[in-house]
């Protein structure tokens, strides 16, 4: 084998790994989103589509149990959906996306369907992202924060959110303690947050 061939044989795998690493760091590449079928969601009965790209994102918390493993987060997503559909009589889980402390995003209604997270005024013009857990006295894990921020970057890259979208806390648009004192304080430092 010539010296040139040996050099290529050594360098090519490194260059391929470098290209793959750059590809995964592209903001158009979403944080992992757990699809509905993977967390065993009930079938949605929703039909009202959102008009994309959206100007607003509303961040809330479920105010219930937190989860930190894929298995516990899938169960928690099912619990939230069951409450929304079977107890409240909604067509699906109210949120467009749920964030677990396992660092994963769980698809709720997704980018295309109107949520039931912030009232009749805000639902048709916003995406609702809810952190699974209660964040009155603590912040979500760094993994959960990164997952949410990655989801927002993905929404912009895919054209679901405007590049100048405005982030709101649930309490900014409704009378509620959501997203909890600590999470609310945290999101106020995110670049797209705007006070009421």
From Swiss-Prot:
Where is the protein localized?
Answer: Secreted; Cytoplasmic granule
The signal peptide annotation in the UniProt record is 1-21
Question: Pfam families from the entry?
Answer: Amidase_2
Which SUPFAM superfamilies did the record assign? N-acetylmuramoyl-L-alanine amidase-like
GO molecular function (one):
peptidoglycan binding
List, in alphabetical order, the GO biological process terms annotated in this UniProt record. antimicrobial humoral immune response mediated by antimicrobial peptide; biological process involved in interaction with host; defense response to bacterium; defense response to Gram-positive bacterium; detection of bacterium; immune response; innate immune response; killing of cells of another organism
Sites bearing Pyrrolidone carboxylic acid, chain numbering: 22
Question: Matching InterPro entries, A to Z?
Answer: Amidase/PGRP_sf, Amidase_domain, Peptidoglycan_recognition, PGRP, PGRP_domain_met/bac
Q: How is it modified after translation?
A: N-glycosylated. N-glycosylation is required for bactericidal activity.
Q: Where is the N-acetylmuramoyl-L-alanine amidase domain?
A: 53-180
Residues glycosylated per entry: 112
Gene Ontology CC: extracellular exosome; extracellular region; extracellular space; phagocytic vesicle lumen; specific granule lumen; tertiary granule lumen
What top-level branch of life does the organism fall under? Eukaryota
What keywords appear on the UniProt entry?
A: Antibiotic, Antimicrobial, Disulfide bond, Glycoprotein, Immunity, Innate immunity, Pyrrolidone carboxylic acid, Secreted, Signal
What is the similarity comment for this entry? Answer: Belongs to the N-acetylmuramoyl-L-alanine amidase 2 family.
Subunit notes for this chain?
Answer: Homodimer; disulfide-linked. Interacts with HSPA1A; this interaction forms a cytotoxic complex that is released by lymphokine-activated killer cells. Interacts with HSPBP1; this interaction blocks the cytotoxic activity of the PGLYRP1-HSPA1A complex. Interacts with TNFRSF1A; this interaction is important for cell death induction. Interacts with S100A4; this complex acts as a chemoattractant that promotes lymphocyte movement. Interacts with TREM1.
Name the record gives this protein: Peptidoglycan recognition protein 1
Q: Which organism is it from?
A: Homo sapiens (Human)
